[in-house]
């Protein structure tokens, strides 16, 4: 099984945590979509990550991948059992992927971390302030109303909805923003519980190999962190904007 995508992406991080939780072996091609080659465009027509390749099957979109993994490898489920709970889980995941992902990635992580290095574009401080002072707190108010007082959203085992919330907020933390425990105590405690789980902490151990390592040393750094890096890559040396940035 091959996962195409950088482990710093919240959507890739979500899938890697699920693979770790399920005990599934995988190889990783740790590209960002901005450095995907023409073959990557064929795999992912929206030039988004992650992409899962399982034999001759290609699956795009982290939500679709998570559901495929739960159906194909059901021993350790990440979706709840009942129809009502599954619907709730899917909605929370959608909110996290869409709203939190938009704010944490495109509102914070991309302008502060990615754009200055890849596209030599300085951040717009007014736009950042709108996210950190208005939009993101509003989203966290909604999350706080649904955060579990103990354990996880659907019982004593972590699921995909928990990971969907935690993963983009991890990128916000890398960009310098974390939820204030005084304002969002349930959310902060819930995120802290998630951060202690081996399936999740293992993904965090991959971050320095991407964020603090030169491109020519990342393969060795990832392998030192326990990643089986794919022999061939869908990456290229020249960045290009994704469809979402055009």
Residue map of PLM features:
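GST-like fold's C-terminal all-alpha helical module
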Residues: 96-196
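Acidic/histidine-enriched, glycine/proline-rich intrinsically disordered or flexible terminal extensions
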Residues: 207-246
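GST-like domain detector, emphasizing the conserved glutathione-binding G-site
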Residues: 1-130, 233-246
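Charged/polar, low-hydrophobicity segments characteristic of intrinsically disordered regions
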Residues: 132, 136, 196-213
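Residue-level "edge-of-site" marker
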Residues: 31-34, 185, 207-208
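A general structural signal marking secondary-structure boundaries and capping sites
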Residues: 73, 147-150, 198, 207
